[in-house]
């Protein structure tokens, strides 16, 4: 089973992580594989909450840069995260993992409202909690939502699953000389403008001394490895 190093974690997935190789929408095989892996993490005894982006369906920032009202675009992005959250709930429950979706925007027919104490009770009972609709406010990314929810539920760490195996000095797919950083401080991330999380999310983690681990979600077994304390990817923390 493995023994969890982190008792309570918040896993942040990009919307693209659900799209698989097609690059958009939701790929059933990909989401089923992620659900099966999360089931293994739950079996270790670790408590896991999820925040999923919406970029596989709609990108608010991209739409606003082309003339759409930023607040409207961001609300559309929040709805995209709810589509992903419901899809992930379905995939998790199909593999036998009790899952609750909590939305920052009221939509009582499809999800619980976000209530911090209720979310913590769900986690204590061994359920997965998926936080949808970001923070419920425009101008805030799902990275910031992940940082905020992680603080609120008392998570030990944020795990950011991406398509690369850590943080690099440049895009490793475009620049063969890019260097991978095994460890970084929050200030290094902010000063170098590294694509870990946006500055608001990183600053929030820094102020509350919450570690961030960036790792490759596309390799099966990596979520469990990180939760059990194996050093893969890049860890971002204080001095």
Swiss-Prot record:
Annotated pathway: Pyrimidine metabolism; CTP biosynthesis via de novo pathway; UDP from UMP (UMPK route): step 1/1
Name this polypeptide is given: Uridylate kinase
GO molecular function, one term: ATP binding
Gene3D superfamilies the record matches: Acetylglutamate kinase-like (3.40.1160.10)
Binding site for UMP: 54, 74, 135-142
EC nos: 2.7.4.22
Gene Ontology biological process terms, A to Z: 'de novo' CTP biosynthetic process; UDP biosynthetic process
List of residues binding ATP: 12-15, 55, 59, 162, 168, 171
Residue span of region Involved in allosteric activation by GTP: 20-25
Family: Belongs to the UMP kinase family.
InterPro entries on file: AceGlu_kinase-like_sf, Asp/Glu/Uridylate_kinase, Uridylate_kinase, Uridylate_kinase_bac
Regulation: Allosterically activated by GTP. Inhibited by UTP.
Quaternary structure and partners: Homohexamer.
Keyword Nucleotide-binding tagged: yes
Pfam family, one: AA_kinase
Catalytic activity annotation: UMP + ATP = UDP + ADP
Localisation per UniProt entry: Cytoplasm
Function according to Swiss-Prot or TrEMBL: Catalyzes the reversible phosphorylation of UMP to UDP.
Species of provenance: Geobacter sulfurreducens (strain ATCC 51573 / DSM 12127 / PCA)
Annotated Gene Ontology cellular component terms: cytosol
Keywords per UniProt: Allosteric enzyme, ATP-binding, Cytoplasm, Kinase, Nucleotide-binding, Pyrimidine biosynthesis, Transferase
